[in-house]
From Swiss-Prot:
It is found in: Cell inner membrane. The keyword Cell membrane applies. Residues 46-57, 74-85 have a biased composition (Basic and acidic residues). It comes from Shewanella sp. (strain ANA-3). The chain crosses the membrane at residues 1-21. The Tat system comprises two distinct complexes: a TatABC complex, containing multiple copies of TatA, TatB and TatC subunits, and a separate TatA complex, containing only TatA subunits. Substrates initially bind to the TatABC complex, which probably triggers association of the separate TatA complex to form the active translocon. GO terms for cellular component: TAT protein transport complex. This is Sec-independent protein translocase protein TatA.
């Protein structure tokens, strides 16, 4: 009926085991698992790094906004010539 039955999958699995052997398949599975684990670790470390950078950027913006010194103009008025005499 067009689909692959369980018996066909078992026959394919048996042929693969006979061709490659269990040791080769075990090492291949371990390598594949290690690759998937490494990929997940890389993705999570990239997300952590991006979150850390976003937090630092937000903190620096907040610090810059609150730490802006207010400049007060303290102009010294020149003394007039009349007062000096």
């Amino acid at each position: 009926m067009g689909g692959i039955s369980i018996w066909q999958l078992l026959i394919i699995a048996l042929i693969v085991v006979l061709l490659f052997g269990t040791k080769k398949l075990r090492s291949l599975g371990g390598d594949l698992g290690g690759a998937v684990k490494g990929f997940k670790n890389a993705m999570s470390s990239d997300e952590d790094k991006k979150a850390l950078e976003d937090a630092e950027a937000a903190k620096s913006v907040q610090t810059a906004q609150t730490a802006q010194p207010t400049q007060q103009a303290t102009e010294k008025k020149p003394e007039s010539n009349k007062e000096q005499a």
